[in-house]
């Protein structure tokens, strides 16, 4: 998208922000997701529900707008990295206000925030791999103003010595570009409905993601159960098939029994939906 007028650039910025927020809502509503909040209920959560997730997603639209606006046609450098970090932390504070202190989308702010910024850096358009590469370049830069605190995800990543959300972004979101997007397109091509194709994309992520949300609650055995169950869904034909849906129901029961929710995979699914909609 070359030499957009200021009016058209602002229109694109607004569209990116709306799309990012809409993808969070679409991910939350998608059903049936194993262990996750969806249109059926709260999954393995006591403090989350669909209305709260939707309120959180809408509260983040101004943050996504600011990220796109501040990143428009800028190179990946320390100044932009620190701006993106500051806006992300401000967005997290707004999320907490909207939810009464419940962490609904901290991981999604990181993943989607980087991808929104990356699209804007490229002038509002780009192929999915180019967008992911731009996000990775930004994620690899240090943010000198980031607080020296440890999230649950970071603690789990270090305890179990597995890559977390930071490494996923710094590597260019391989679970999106190599697994989720190809699976989404493959399932659509085979005649799956859009919700079924999106569930298959979630399964593709879950087959190999070291989801620190699951690790925090259920340890390595729980993570392996999640990965194996997701593999079985896809091996059975995916969610468009009766056998695949039966395997998905079994995986849902396993996650609920473990009291574990693959929140990291859900964040990456929302980011997958965003890339699918904005990439040229």
UniProtKB/Swiss-Prot annotation:
Q: Does the keyword Transferase apply?
A: yes
Tell me a Gene Ontology molecular-function term this record carries.
ATP binding
Q: Give the EC number(s) listed in the UniProt record.
A: 2.4.2.52
Chemical reaction(s) catalysed: 3'-dephospho-CoA + ATP = 2'-(5''-triphospho-alpha-D-ribosyl)-3'-dephospho-CoA + adenine
Gene (UniProt): mdcB
Origin, by domain of life? Bacteria
Q: Where is the signal peptide?
A: none
Keyword set, alphabetical order = ATP-binding, Nucleotide-binding, Transferase
* GO process annotations (BP): prosthetic group biosynthetic process
What enzyme category does the UniProt record give?
transferase
| Sequence similarity | Belongs to the CitG/MdcB family.
Q: Does the keyword tRNA processing apply?
A: no
Q: What is this protein called?
A: 2-(5''-triphosphoribosyl)-3'-dephosphocoenzyme-A synthase
Write out the function statement from the record: Involved in the formation of 2-(5''-phosphoribosyl)-3'-dephosphocoenzyme-A, the prosthetic group of the acyl-carrier protein of the malonate decarboxylase.
